[in-house]
């Protein structure tokens, strides 16, 4: 039901911090799936608890653009612990989440207290309130983004749409894509392997790749030449009867 192995569940329940009355998180599920929630609650010992996580409304249509967040790894902590990251932190892994990690990341609150044997606070020694991350506003039009994504569907393509008057980017699409919500909720090994081994490379962000413009750039250089007065638009620069053919100097040496 949750695509979590029995071994993983036993490992979580056997963690050193777990007490008889502890709530041990096993798996995140999307809120609102009432049927699954009802099925889970029929299992003895299972409880549901709300948590605050990223939600990506456009799903796969903007997956490569938004990117996703994940829990920090041990390697992350080695590099970032002095910046306030800890074992329960999340970090942007790709897309806008990664590019604007410093702006989007909230600051955890801290409270240091003296408590009695029953856990009641006697004195607060230090307190730092939590701070939300900043809002980052983009010019992406959700409808344009979804339409562009649907046009290409499963084809390995990329597309961009801009407002020609302002230069604002209205859509950035890479297909096929992936749903970033899967990374937030956690995916099974089988699902991860399927994404990784898919021949169409849904994890590849094609719109950030570089592409050689080739002959499509000739029109631009010609326009610049005409605008600068170097090229006469009425002059025929074509040469009849001449052609180019590669010679031995173009031989590929393996």
Describe these PLM feature segments:
Residues 1-158, 173, 178-205, 210:
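Extracytoplasmic/periplasmic proteins that interact with beta-lactams or build/remodel peptidoglycan
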Residues 38, 65, 148, 167, ...:
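Residue-level preference for non-acidic, small/hydrophobic
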Residues 120, 167-168:
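Residue-level signal for well-ordered, solvent-exposed loop/turn and beta-edge residues enriched
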Residues 159-164:
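Short hydrophobic alpha-helical segments used for membrane anchoring or interfacial signaling
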Residues 165-166, 243:
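Short, internal active-site loops enriched in acidic
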Residues 168, 210-213:
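A glycine-rich, coil/turn loop motif that links secondary-structure elements
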Residues 173-175, 183-186, 212-254:
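Short, glycine/proline-biased beta-turn/loop segments that scaffold the active-site neighborhood
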């Amino acid at each position: 039901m949750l695509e979590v192995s029995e071994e993983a569940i036993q490992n979580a329940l056997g963690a050193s911090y777990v007490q008889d009355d502890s709530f041990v998180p096993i798996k995140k599920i999307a809120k609102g799936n009432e049927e699954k929630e009802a099925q889970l609650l029929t299992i003895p010992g299972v409880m549901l608890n709300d948590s605050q996580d990223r939600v990506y409304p456009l799903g796969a249509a903007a997956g490569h653009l938004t990117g996703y967040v994940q829990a920090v790894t041990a390697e992350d902590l080695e590099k970032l612990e002095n910046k306030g990251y800890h074992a329960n932190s999340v970090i942007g892994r790709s897309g806008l989440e990664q590019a604007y990690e410093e702006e989007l990341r909230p600051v955890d609150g801290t409270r240091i207290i003296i408590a009695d044997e029953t856990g009641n606070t006697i004195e607060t020694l230090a307190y730092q309130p939590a701070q939300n991350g900043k809002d980052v506003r983009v010019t992406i039009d959700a409808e344009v983004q979804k339409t562009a994504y649907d046009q290409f569907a499963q084809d390995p393509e990329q597309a961009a749409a801009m407002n020609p008057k302002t230069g604002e980017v209205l859509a950035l699409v890479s297909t096929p894509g992936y749903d970033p919500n899967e990374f937030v909720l956690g995916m099974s090994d089988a699902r991860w392997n399927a994404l990784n081994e898919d021949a169409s490379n849904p994890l590849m962000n094609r719109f950030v790749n570089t592409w050689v413009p080739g002959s499509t750039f000739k029109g631009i250089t010609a326009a610049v030449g005409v605008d600068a007065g170097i090229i006469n638009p009425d002059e025929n620069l074509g040469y009849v009867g001449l052609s180019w053919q590669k010679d031995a100097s173009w031989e590929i040496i393996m």
